[in-house]
């Protein structure tokens, strides 16, 4: 017979209260159980000592007999120091998706182009002759205007 240590839900609607029970794995969640070894009240504060109440001696006994705890109960057992929980590692979960990678590459390309433009030597020598040409044109314009004024006066 496969035995598991799991939570059996009790309490009213929207007011959950769980018993930590040892039960046959084939029995319903809230159905028959072999032994109640604790309680879990998720409505209490996380630092409240009554949030998880566990009979560690009975939990150790059932684990030695071969009972398999569910994930949530395994967390409680780990917190109580009864059984160490295996650390899970899923590095692919944190890896960004394909579209996010494409956006990051585009952003990196834009930044690289902006840095190249900023680091490239500015074309100041080419800009200075253009400024000189404008001053020369401006110097010629008053002479032409003066000539135009003289011709209209005559």
From Swiss-Prot:
Alphabetical list of InterPro entries matching this protein: Ribosomal_bS16 (IPR000307), Ribosomal_bS16_CS (IPR020592), Ribosomal_bS16_dom_sf (IPR023803)
Record keyword Ribonucleoprotein present: yes
Domain of life: Bacteria
Ranges of Basic and acidic residues composition bias in the record: 92-109
Any one GO cellular component localisation term in the record: small ribosomal subunit
Low complexity: compositionally biased ranges: 110-129
Gene Ontology molecular-function annotations: structural constituent of ribosome
Matching Pfam families: Ribosomal_S16
Compositionally biased residues, Acidic residues: 142-154
Gene3D superfamilies: 3.30.1320.10
Key words of the record: Ribonucleoprotein, Ribosomal protein
Family, similarity comment: Belongs to the bacterial ribosomal protein bS16 family.
Designated name of the protein: Small ribosomal subunit protein bS16
Taxon lineage: Bacteria, Pseudomonadati, Pseudomonadota, Alphaproteobacteria, Sphingomonadales
